[in-house]
């Protein structure tokens, strides 16, 4: 266990950050699931709207360092490809 005041503070900060990061990751996953559900339903309009919301949340999480930029780009690319395939 942390003995010095500095170590106790660092442990407190680490726990707060862990909880905040987990909440942000969970929110991103939820938005990605909404896009996939909209794609599965076959409604391109709702899929595009859900995609736009997901991109916003994903980009915000990436700016804050919760996700690697390449991972965010990969998610966006794959979802966009699925939405474009719906139109064809």
Curated annotation (Swiss-Prot):
A single GO molecular function term of this UniProt record: small ribosomal subunit rRNA binding
Annotated segments matching region Disordered: 1-23, 69-88
UniProt xrefs under NCBIfam families: S20
UniProtKB keywords: Ribonucleoprotein, Ribosomal protein, RNA-binding, rRNA-binding
ATP-binding as UniProt keyword: no
PANTHER family: 30S RIBOSOMAL PROTEIN S20, SMALL RIBOSOMAL SUBUNIT PROTEIN BS20C
Gene name for this UniProt entry: rpsT
Name the record gives this protein: Small ribosomal subunit protein bS20
Bias-annotated ranges (Basic residues): 69-81
SUPFAM superfamilies the record matches: Ribosomal protein S20
Pfam families (alphabetical): Ribosomal_S20p (PF01649)
Gene Ontology cellular component annotations, sorted alphabetically: cytosol; small ribosomal subunit
Function as written in the Swiss-Prot or TrEMBL entry: Binds directly to 16S ribosomal RNA.
BP GO annotations: translation
Source organism of this protein record: Alcanivorax borkumensis (strain ATCC 700651 / DSM 11573 / NCIMB 13689 / SK2)
UniProt similarity note: Belongs to the bacterial ribosomal protein bS20 family.
